[in-house]
């Protein structure tokens, strides 16, 4: 049952091997391309199978150590500090080593949170409609809407709203007065003052004439979010090629994954975020694991280190999500929760671990690698875990 | 409310029944508690999953077609 144009005999030969689906497909396409006969096909399939079985990890192979080395070595070639630009237009994204450290440390919030927001079909193809979503996401504060001036003589804050901006940011409302009214209401409920609104002019002042209160009001006014999501400071809209045509994709500076998924027009099946904790909260551990792998792989690729095998990154992500939550590698996470005192002491803050272990009377079973290296015994990996015994009978 | 299971990043989760679970545990010679865990509050869990259940997760694997893993539901 293959999509490739090969004879039934060849198919039987290839299907007979222990290869995984993906490799079988590759074998098929090579056979099809070269037009080889059944005998040759059999030999090819057997050779590929032998090679595949050879490259599988042996029992007792120290996969963790190999992963650590395989990520660590390319890590030394990474840039210590890169800001600016990450393939995505005009958006600052932390990259290189700082980003990698951030990921394995499982920081609560990344240095530069961002989201990639995909849109539902009707929004994704129409620039106007895509902009509707942009204004639902990007936080709109008063400075973007008009000019604020303080009238000290009458103790008033005066806002002169810009009509064009209003119409642009509220694309579904056509009446600037109605929008200004909405803004005035938001101000009233947030600052607890009464406002006077006429056309696009809004003015209000403190209850008692006080210069300090007046300035305080202006400060607070600047913080109010009139539209959009508070955390998101900027949205960039980009046209991207897809398999079937073009679509608009939004990139955001700042992230609030949960809020964005609920917005109308947002495709909740493809939208992603670079904060693994937000993904975990909204989509669960498995999605967080996927994101961890994607993000670490992208970080390495961005630095031209794409020859690191994904399997290493998958192992790291597996360990980090093993307990059903996201744990960091390191003293406060995986390495700090090891059973062995000696292994923990060998990692960081040696004295504290030894002291605590002594106080609590901990016992070290000497099961792991580090402990055995410390006490000078063979480690239980590879040939170290195999015991040979001489037979008692002679024959 | 957004349907979490529709997201590309979320693989298929399903509760494993007793017999299947027994087969899996004997195959790998492990106890149920040796499995990786998943929190009861996890968004991707099926509604009928309870603490102590094991869920089967069928991932779209990067290295083969699909990878089947199991997680034990914990508090």
Curated annotation (Swiss-Prot), chain A:
GO cellular component: cytoplasm; DNA-directed RNA polymerase complex
Enzyme Commission designation: 2.7.7.6
Top-rank taxon: Archaea
Enzyme superclass (EC): transferase
Family: Belongs to the RNA polymerase beta' chain family.
NCBIfam families, per the entry: RNA_pol_rpoA2
Protein name as it appears in the record: DNA-directed RNA polymerase subunit Rpo1C
Gene source species: Haloarcula marismortui (strain ATCC 43049 / DSM 3752 / JCM 8966 / VKM B-1809) (Halobacterium marismortui)
């Amino acid at each position: 049952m293959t999509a490739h144009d090969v004879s039934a005999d060849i198919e039987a030969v290839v299907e007979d091997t222990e290869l995984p689906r993906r490799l079988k497909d590759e074998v098929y396409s090579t056979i099809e391309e070269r037009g080889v006969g059944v005998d040759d096909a059999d030999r090819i399939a057997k050779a590929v199978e032998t090679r595949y079985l050879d490259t599988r990890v042996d029992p007792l192979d120290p996969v963790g150590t190999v992963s650590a080395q395989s990520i660590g070595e390319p890590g030394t070639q990474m840039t210590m500090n890169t800001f600016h630009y990450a393939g995505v237009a005009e958006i600052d994204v932390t990259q290189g080593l700082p980003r990698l450290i951030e990921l394995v440390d499982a920081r609560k919030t990344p240095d530069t949170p961002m989201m990639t927001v995909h849109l539902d079909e009707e929004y994704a193809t129409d620039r106007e409609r895509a902009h509707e979503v942009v204004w639902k996401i990007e936080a709109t504060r008063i400075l973007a809407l008009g000019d604020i001036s303080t009238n000290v003589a009458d103790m008033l804050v005066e806002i002169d709203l810009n009509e064009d901006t209003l119409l642009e940011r509220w694309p579904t409302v056509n009446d600037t007065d109605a929008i200004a009214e909405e803004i005035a209401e938001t101000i009233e409920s947030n600052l607890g003052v009464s406002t006077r609104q006429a056309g696009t002019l809004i003015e209000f002042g403190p209850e008692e004439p006080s210069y300090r209160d007046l300035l305080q009001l202006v400060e607070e006014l600047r913080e109010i979010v009139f539209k959009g999501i508070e955390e998101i400071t900027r949205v960039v809209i980009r046209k991207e090629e897809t398999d079937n045509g073009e679509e608009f994709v939004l990139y955001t500076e700042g992230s609030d994954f949960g809020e964005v998924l609920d917005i109308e027009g947002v495709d909740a099946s493809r939208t992603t975020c670079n904060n693994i904790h937000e993904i975990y909260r909204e989509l669960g551990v498995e999605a967080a694991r996927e994101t961890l792998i994607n993000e670490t792989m992208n970080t390495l690729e961005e630095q031209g280190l794409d020859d690191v095998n994904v399997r290493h990154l998958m192992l790291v992500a597996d360990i980090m999500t093993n307990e059903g939550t996201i744990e960091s590698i390191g003293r406060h996470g995986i390495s700090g929760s090891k059973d062995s005192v000696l292994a923990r002491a060998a990692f960081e803050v040696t004295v504290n671990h030894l002291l605590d272990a002594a106080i609590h009377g901990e016992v070290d079973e000497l099961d792991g690698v580090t402990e055995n290296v410390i006490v000078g015994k063979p480690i239980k990996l590879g040939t170290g875990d195999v015991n040979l015994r001489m037979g008692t009978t002679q024959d | 409310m957004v349907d979490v299971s529709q997201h590309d990043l979320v693989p298929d989760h399903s509760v494993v029944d007793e017999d299947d679970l027994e087969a899996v545990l004997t195959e790998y010679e492990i106890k149920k508690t040796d499995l990786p865990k998943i929190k009861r509050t996890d968004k991707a869990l099926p509604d009928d999953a309870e603490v102590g259940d094991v869920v089967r997760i069928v991932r779209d694997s990067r290295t083969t077609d699909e990878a089947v893993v199991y997680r034990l539901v914990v508090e």
